[in-house]
Amino acid sequence: VHRNGKFYLYYGDANSGGIGVAVSDLPTGPYIDNHDRPVVGMDTPGVLLYDENNRCIKNKKGVPGAISGSENWGMWCFDPCVFVDDDGQAYMYLGGAHPDNSRIIKLKENMTEVDGSAVKPNTPGFFEASFVHKYRGKYYFSYAGHYFGKPANIEYVMSDKPMEGFRNPGVILPNPPVNDGFNNHHSIFQFKGEWYIAYHNRKVAYENNEQDQRSREYMRSVCIDRLFHNEDGTVQTVEVTRDGLEQLKNVDPYRRNEAETMAKGYGIDTEFKARGCSDRIVTSIHNGDYLKIRGVDFKNGG
């Protein structure tokens, strides 16, 4: 998240069981977390729920969670999404392991402290992977709905407010082909007036004929497809493809192109052009090394 002239990288901290933040002057880093506590932790007001006798609600194994049923694995304080609204107010969406474990909380302007208590929105089927986008004044809270036998779809709820009133649950993205029913994570973004969704499957793991179950589960390939909103504000279910989008425009070989603009490379490496500069150059070039650029328009030259 870019704000106050800084870039903020939020992450799940396994050591604290909460969500930390690292800060950098550049989007490419280096990022440093010099805070003495997580931004959101199990002790943050509203993260854990309490009964009428002010006792923390736990599952049958004694793990703090949102309900007392054995199917709840306990609160997962991770997978943060930070959204900055048009008025400058920042919110964090987080949680995991059970539909009752999603949370929303305001952030202060410094982006490293919370403002008030977390609230529990209505997120049927919620499992993990919180994400929020805004379209025509409506807020869309989407998430991985992989919950105990339920298909691992990307689902969503929508509201006129960023912290309450979420309704109309639906499926944005069905579990994609070549994903073997595993979970998913996603981002939704606008580029040149069009909306897209980024997610993952296991295509490369399958093409490499990975036999180990753990390798197939964790070797994930990034995918992008188009996303469309209906006139009533709801989101059309994405038509999931196997090969992704066509290249949006050709590469112009007669202008300066950064080194990471490549379809494939072998042997070479890239590095920053200079300290404090985000531009990259190709380095470590040896005999036999190559890079390939796809979709180049040479026009009448070349």
Where are these regions (language model features)?
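Carbohydrate-active catalytic/glycan-binding domains of CAZyme proteins
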Residues: 1-302
